[in-house]
Amino acid sequence: HGLGEYMYRHGLKNYGVIVHNADFYATNQRDNAAKQVLAEEYPDLRLCGEVRFENEGEVYRKTRELIKRYPEIEALYISWDGPAIESIEALTELGRTDIAISTGDLDYAVAMNMAKGGMVKALSAQCPFEQGQAIALAAVKSVLGEEVPSFVGVEPITVTPENLLRAWKQVFKEEAGEELTQAFKENPNYVFEK
C-alpha cells in the first residue's frame, strides 16, 4: 500500500517494477502481492514496465534501460533494499531523483535515504524478532504433536518518513543511531513523531 498511497497523495500515475527473477518463495510472494495491490487497489495507476534481475549487479543497468524506455515513470517498486540502492545510483546518474521508490527490508542505507528526504518513500520491513518467536512456537507445537502450518510468516510493517524512527526501534529493538536521527532532523521536511 505504501507506494500506491504515496502516488495518490502526490498526484503520480506511472510506475514500474524491478523484481527478482528467482524461485524464492517469500520474495516471489512479496513481489506478486505488491503488484496485485497496485493493480487492484489503485486502478488509476499505470504499470509502464517490469524488469527482472538475476543478481543485484544487474539492477543498475536494468534501471537505466527501464527509465530510458519509459521516461514517464514516476515511481518504482523494487524487491528489496540492495537492488533499491543500485536503482538509486542509476536514477541519480540519470538526473531522475524525482522518482519515488518503495522497497522491502529496512536497513541503514534505505533508512538514511528516507531520513534525508531521498527517493525512498515507503518500504515494507520484516520483523525478525517476531519471526523467530513464531517459528519457535511452531517448533514447540510440532514437538507436542500439534498441527503446524506449512509456512510461518509475520505481517511486515509499512515504514514511511512519518514513522521511520519508531519502526526502526520496533524492528531492531533499539533506538535509531545518532547519525540516522540527526539526518532526519536536518531534513527540511522532517515530521516530528509523537
Description of each model-found segment:
Residues 1-15, 59-60, 106-111, 127-144:
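Hydrophobic alpha-helical segments within soluble ligand-binding/sensing domains
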Residues 14-17, 35-57:
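Short beta-strand elements in bilobed, periplasmic/extracellular small-molecule ligand-binding domains
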Residues 18-29, 78-81:
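Extracytoplasmic "Venus flytrap"
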